Amino acid sequence: LKCHKLVPPVWKTCPEGKNLCYKMFMVSTSTVPVKRGCIDVCPKNSALVKYVCCSTDKCN
């Protein structure tokens, strides 16, 4: 699986076990992603951040 890093079109190949791409938003400004990459479990939302995840190449 290949996921974008913070700024597309830069991307990396995910390590084994982290088979979801994610983009993370601050809940207060949920339009601009603050972080992108590979993740193992999703969703991992909290009071401050929201994760949007997917399981296909470069979909974040």
UniProtKB/Swiss-Prot annotation:
GO biological process: killing of cells of another organism
UniProt keywords, alphabetically: Cardiotoxin, Cytolysis, Disulfide bond, Membrane, Secreted, Target cell membrane, Target membrane, Toxin
Primary localization class, coarse: secreted
Tissue expression pattern: Expressed by the venom gland.
Pfam families given in the database record: Toxin_cobra-type (PF21947)
Molecular function GO labels: toxin activity
Gene3D superfamilies: CD59
Keyword Iron: no
UniProt superkingdom: Eukaryota
Disulfide bonds: C3-C21, C14-C38, C42-C53, C54-C59
Subcellular localization, as worded in the UniProt entry: Secreted; Target cell membrane
CC terms in the record's Gene Ontology section: extracellular region; membrane; other organism cell membrane
Function: Shows cytolytic activity on many different cells by forming pore in lipid membranes. In vivo, increases heart rate or kills the animal by cardiac arrest. In addition, it binds to heparin with high affinity, interacts with Kv channel-interacting protein 1 (KCNIP1) in a calcium-independent manner, and binds to integrin alpha-V/beta-3 (ITGAV/ITGB3) with moderate affinity.
Oligomeric and partner information: Monomer in solution; Homodimer and oligomer in the presence of negatively charged lipids forming a pore with a size ranging between 20 and 30 Angstroms.
Family statement drawn from the similarity comment of this UniProt entry: Belongs to the three-finger toxin family. Short-chain subfamily. Type IA cytotoxin sub-subfamily.
Name this protein carries in UniProt: Cytotoxin 1
Protein source organism: Naja annulifera (Banded Egyptian cobra)
